[in-house]
């Protein structure tokens, strides 16, 4: 995931057992807990978004999420997805079945992809205030956490409005 920091974009990734070169199915990718990525990610989010308008309303729940220690990466991703679904008030649920992901037919995944809002030069009307915007300029295509922490409950209507203008 990519978030906005004071010096520009920050990439946060979860280490996996065997690294990127491991050749296993998605549901078999295990998280590597030899480092303290959870603490580092959470601290980075606190530093980057501590002064945003809505971070304080999500901080405690996010901290609980970062204290979870699922074995598999898909479990972490699913926990995050369910948390975000609640925050965005998305009622369609994505479930894991033995044969893979189950996504409702009417689920519009393009709406929630960063590139769906286009690039910065094409979509100046989709801007919102970012914490370090005065220093870095507007940074497009960041994690959903960026508009969530900056727009709060209005993030869903922002995404819906932006998607109808593409």
Where are the model-predicted features located?
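Residues lining hydrophobic/aromatic ligand-binding pockets adjacent to catalytic sites
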Residues: 1-166
